[in-house]
């Protein structure tokens, strides 16, 4: 799988300082929750086809540190949820969020590339948010991710679009964060899945704009940086308001904050 550009120590230094995120709530229709609502719509499309018996319908989140999504997948789709992460701090925080939401789930402390054998070829669904783009060999990382899927299982890979405007801003405002990513466009992400032996069902840019994906922790320490951060968030919110009044703002290579890939394991 190769080495990650982002170390465990880097992530834990961030997580110790930040408040736990609230669990994802698709019933909050406020504008600040717009990106969650977009992802909720995506997942309802992807998982609507799930027709397995309840005792076989399970989901694994890769890189589940302080996951706000595990309770969502349990409550909204009835998945038996499991998470895996290599950070003790991140795993403990994920367990805390599950407990706060009253959701049963398993969180395993392990590296994705050397996971316990009982987790392999086990899951009907696998998801990851911002994981595979940290590895130089994307196809090898995806091959390790796909090893958790049962034959016929579905995997959803979400990464930030570091090839577009968001990536350029991150490079300018926080080069040290940008350098932790391998910039991948939709074509490269699709190809990496195919090389990893997965069948791609869809691979595309997702959401028109969301500057909230930027990591601006360093510049927020200054008044100017805080002002810029708030201005960028206001611009994002303005585009979401336009979309709510039926102005069509399609996802695209330049402005979209995410690239998503939905794939399946055929054998």
Which positions does each model-derived feature cover?
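Short alpha-helix
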Residues: 181-197
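A C-terminal cap/extension of S-adenosyl-L-methionine-dependent methyltransferases
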Residues: 170, 202-267
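A short glycine-rich, Lys/Arg-flanked "PGG" loop and its adjoining helix->strand segment in the class I
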Residues: 139-151
């Amino acid at each position: 799988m190769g080495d990650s550009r982002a170390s465990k120590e880097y992530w834990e230094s961030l997580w110790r300082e930040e408040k736990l995120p609230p669990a994802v709530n698709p019933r909050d229709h406020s504008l600040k929750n717009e990106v969650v609502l977009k992802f909720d719509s995506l997942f309802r499309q992807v998982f609507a086809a799930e027709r397995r018996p309840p005792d076989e319908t399970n989901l694994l989140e890769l890189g589940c540190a302080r996951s706000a999504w595990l309770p969502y997948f349990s409550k909204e789709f009835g998945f038996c949820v499991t998470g895996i992460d290599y950070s003790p701090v991140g795993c403990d925080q994920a367990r805390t969020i599950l407990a706060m939401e009253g959701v049963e789930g398993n969180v395993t402390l392990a590296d994705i590339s050397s996971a316990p054998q009982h987790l392999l070829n086990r899951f009907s669904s696998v998801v990851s948010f911002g994981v595979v783009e940290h590895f130089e060999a994307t196809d090898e990382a995806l091959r390790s991710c796909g090893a958790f899927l049962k034959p016929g299982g579905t995997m959803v890979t979400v990464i930030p679009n570091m090839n577009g405007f968001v990536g350029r801003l991150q490079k300018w405002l926080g080069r040290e964060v940008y350098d932790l990513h391998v910039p991948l466009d939709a074509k490269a992400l699709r190809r990496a899945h195919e090389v990893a032996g997965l069948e791609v069902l869809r691979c595309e840019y997702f959401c028109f704009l969301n500057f909230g994906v930027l990591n601006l922790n360093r510049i927020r320490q200054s008044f100017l940086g805080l002002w810029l951060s708030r201005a960028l968030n206001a611009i994002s919110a303005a585009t979401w308001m336009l979309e709510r009044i039926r102005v069509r703002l399609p996802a695209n290579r330049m402005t979209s904050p995410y690239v998503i890939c939905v794939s399946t394991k055929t054998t």
